[in-house]
Amino acid sequence: MHKGTFHMSRLTDTLAAKLEEAGITQAELARRVGQSQQAINNLFAGRAASSMVWRELARELGIDEQEMRQMMTEAGRDPEKVTSLAGLRKYRAVLPSPREPFPIIRQQEHLPRPNATIGEETNMEPRKKKLLPVLGEAVGGEDGEYIFNGSVLDYVDCPPSLENVPNAYAVYIDGESMVPRFRPGETVWVHPTKPPRRGDDVVIQIHPDNEDDGAPPRGFVKEFVGWTANKLVLQQYNPTKKIEFTREQVVSVHPIILAGKYW
């Protein structure tokens, strides 16, 4: 067994054993630590090596804090590293800025004068890495339903193709309705202003059945087939079937431009 796989197995095996000892479900654990069930499932399934709420998880499961940190570090990620958006901003605030001018090299008399000049010195600020919010709380079911209530589940790195796209976001794939195209636990990155084309994978949002009770839009990840005169037509892979919504039901159709566990 690969060393990293062994360490990840130690983490996931310990979490599973402690959860069973505690007599609670992943859903209940997620509720107690203020995380989505998807985020907790990613950790238990080995798709994530750490969590922003690792101390709370250790406390709820009766794991020594130092042991918890050690297992996560062995699995490939030190939980003490800055990973949250607020933490990243705090980290950037203390980065030194190269404000000292570059040293000037004096022209020596015996050397020929250069026939080109160097431009004025500029204050080179460190490039700030953009993060995108992960939206859509998984509901589950055969169709892989989500709820888009505005809650941010996590933050992920922004790919270059979305750096200048306002309101771009990501979604964690849940369920198997789009296997083999997407598998549970993968991340998809979404372009909210690009028109979808036939064959594109998309994130769609649908008005709730009863908007009067203030329910948020429902969402799905499907393949875009097209529009008819009065319907949106989509394709699902597993089980294979066509899905249709009336135009009045549709809130948005956003194409997925990138997918994978890592990019």
Curated annotation (Swiss-Prot):
Gene3D superfamilies: lambda repressor-like DNA-binding domains (1.10.260.40), Umud Fragment, subunit A (2.10.109.10). Pfam families: HTH_3 (PF01381), Peptidase_S24 (PF00717). GO terms for biological process: signal transduction. GO terms for molecular function: DNA binding. The gene is C. Residues 26-45 bind DNA. The keyword Transcription regulation applies. This is Repressor protein C. SUPFAM superfamilies: lambda repressor-like DNA-binding domains, LexA/Signal peptidase. Keywords: DNA-binding, Early protein, Repressor, Transcription, Transcription regulation. SMART domains: HTH_XRE. CDD domains: HTH_XRE, S24_LexA-like. PROSITE patterns: HTH_CROC1. Residues 15-68 form the HTH cro/C1-type domain. The keyword NADP does not apply. It comes from the Viruses. It comes from Rhizobium phage 16-3.
